[in-house]
């Protein structure tokens, strides 16, 4: 049986290979295939997969040319009256299990003394196996473009963005988030051009969703490290978080995304960091998911 570390390395290696092959567009064909949904979460508030499971299932769907966006365990499929087709293989996805550990305070404060103990919540990774509905007798029931119960209908992009209450200023020659003043600087919508992947309007929104992901990193929101400088590891890591977060939001909203030109400058940093430490990929996707959930409210 493969260990957790071996499986994490395999997942990281698959993404690295995609980065090396497709460059900054490594997520494009996956994202355009739609949000992966969970057969076992019918009727829940949010039936979507998030985090690293997005990348795992996006890549697998594209690689195996599946048409359905719905995935389920053997038991979930059986409970829905279906069966897995003979000879089909499952894919591992990640489950984060919480546990508590005892830690000690490192300094005195008004509420506790140095050395006092407290309980801290942590998580460990386990894996479980899922099948795409194309691999089962439920294929026709969960055909392409058929969302399962509980999946969100497409939301108007402007409404989605305005609901965040983020301060967005237009008229700039570049697009970026300013943590010290907590606003997003955007070029005018008319300044955006069409590309092979998407039209000008979609490029505007995919860029804005990238910057909106950065906006969630403010200390009053998801509190990520936004103090990095261009070229260093922390800066490149935050860009990976924003790239994944924007891709997920584009997928949810039905926006065809185009990678930022600047992403090419971070690509080698992403590859080197993930090659050195597969956990960096898991951390980036977890933080991107936290950002998306914050924006969704």
Put a short name on every predicted segment.
Residues 1-297:
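N-terminal accessory/interface modules of nucleic-acid-binding and processing proteins
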């Amino acid at each position: 049986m493969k260990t957790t570390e071996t499986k994490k390395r395999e997942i990281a290696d698959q993404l690295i290979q995609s980065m090396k092959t497709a460059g900054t567009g490594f997520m494009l064909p996956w994202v355009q295939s739609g949000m992966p949904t969970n057969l076992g979460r019918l009727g829940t508030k949010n039936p979507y997969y998030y985090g690293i499971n997005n990348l795992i299932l996006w890549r697998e769907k594209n690689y195996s040319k599946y048409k359905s966006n719905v995935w389920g365990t053997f038991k979930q499929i059986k409970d829905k009256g279906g069966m897995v087709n003979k000879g089909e293989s499952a894919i591992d996805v990640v489950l984060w299990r919480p546990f508590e550990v005892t830690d000690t305070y490192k300094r005195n404060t008004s509420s506790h003394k140095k050395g006092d103990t407290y309980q801290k919540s942590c998580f460990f990774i386990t894996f479980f196996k899922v099948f795409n509905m194309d691999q089962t007798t439920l294929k026709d029931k969960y055909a392409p473009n058929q969302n399962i119960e509980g999946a969100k209908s497409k939301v108007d992009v402007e409404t989605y963005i305005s609901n965040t209450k983020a301060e967005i200023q237009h008229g700039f020659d570049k697009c970026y988030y300013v943590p010290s003043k907590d606003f997003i600087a955007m070029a005018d919508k008319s300044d955006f051009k069409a590309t092979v992947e998407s039209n000008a309007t979609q490029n505007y929104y995919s860029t804005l969703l990238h910057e909106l992901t950065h906006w969630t990193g403010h200390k009053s929101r998801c509190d990520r490290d936004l103090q990095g400088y261009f070229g260093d590891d922390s800066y490149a890591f935050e860009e990976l978080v924003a790239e994944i977060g924007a891709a997920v939001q584009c997928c949810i909203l039905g926006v065809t995304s185009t990678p930022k030109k600047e992403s090419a400058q971070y690509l080698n940093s992403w590859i080197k960091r993930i090659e050195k430490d597969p956990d960096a990929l898991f951390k980036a996707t977890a933080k991107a998911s936290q950002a998306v959930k914050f924006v969704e409210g």
